[in-house]
Amino acid sequence: MANTPYPQSYYAASANAVPPRPVLQGEVETDVCVIGAGYTGLSSALFLLENGFRVTVLEAAKVGFGASGRNGGQIVNSYSRDIDVIERSVGPKQAQLLGEMAFEGGRIIRERVAKYQIQCDLKDGGVFAALNSKHMGHLESQKRLWERYGHTQLELLDERRIREVVACDNYVGGLLDMSGGHIHPLNLALGEAAAVESLGGTIYEQSVAVRIERGANPVVHTAQGKVRAKFIIVAGNAYLGNLVPELAAKSMPCGTQVITTAPLGDELAKTLLPQDYCVEDCNYLLDYYRLTRDKRLIFGGGVVYGARDPANIEAIIRPKMLKAFPQLKDVKIDYAWTGNFLLTLSRLPQVGRLGDNIYYSQGCSGHGVTYTHLAGKVLAEALRGQAERFDAFADLPHYPFPGGQLLRTPFAALGAWYYGLRDKLGF
């Protein structure tokens, strides 16, 4: 992946200026080698550096090249699986730990932004929008469940109230989370990378990890160098490839498509989202959108299984945008791109250890902006010998996709077709 540039996205076009970073050449020795300079890797590196570890980060392309620099930019707390489903699959102590941690990622982001003065257009407020009474009942139930874990900041919105925060007639109500919000995701990653370097960490770009030499003193090999470490953190997620085959077997890269309009102007933008909150609906195959600092609308949705890039992203997403906001029918689309996320069969993150010294976290299944920041803290705690929260994730049950890697894409696509049909029929 030598000299791999960022995709032609709005985020890349509006990224903060950063100095070039070196390619790994020769041999380096460190305490922890982190594979991947996305949110999981950068969050892990920051927590470790703050606790006295020497850290080297290997990035196959550029900081935030993958999902961390392409996502919708929404700070969505909790997990991709509802907490009541988690409660039924694990014991009460494990469920309690997972429930307590579910909103921590958003707090970590805000702490990082404040501590390191990261310029990433942070805004408070996120809305889950209900398209029908079943969705609304589900939001009411989830609010009650989250309150049991101490998350009392959630506010139900009736049909009148949701019209005050989003000018879309499709919604019957919603749930407002002021601990949610939105950011410029690539600039958040770039700011975190700068924080890593300010603490003495090293980041090598265009340095693909091609092989991990396991053992008591593991070594990560690249084309032009190698890193000897006491510990390794594997944080490649959907862009890891087959570097660790046992991780690839239980997950699948999937693509989501995003478009960005031309600037709308202050007046039109304010009519769409008067409070400047971000929004996602409650469908299984959901749509999500928000405004940018320069008053564009970013709108995303859809899933392409197997990480294939569709030929015409605008043709897929623009009709979804116009269904929500028909008044934008004459607005030009300036950017369109795909970003991959890593799906697990359970839709819960996979966290664990390979041997005694290789740690990993992957498979956010669409809730990566917040979860990855929590994961970095949990991984760092485990390396310091405090593994209770790590174990709460590591003990979650996970299963390979039926049919293995060959059949996982059609299997998942069939499931998505079923849930998409349910969305259309309002089930």
Segments and roles (model prediction):
Residues E50-R70:
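Glycine-rich FAD pyrophosphate-binding loop
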Residues S78-R160:
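Dinucleotide-binding Rossmann-like beta1-alpha1 core, especially the glycine-rich loop
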Residues M1-V32:
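Extreme N-terminal leader/targeting segments of oxidoreductases
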Residues T30-V57:
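N-terminal Rossmann-like FAD-binding beta1-loop-alpha1 element of flavoenzymes
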Residues R107, K115-K123, A209-R211, N217, ...:
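Active-site substrate-recognition segment that forms the wall
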Residues G137, S141-L145, N170-K230:
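Helical element adjacent to the flavin cofactor pocket in flavoenzyme catalytic cores
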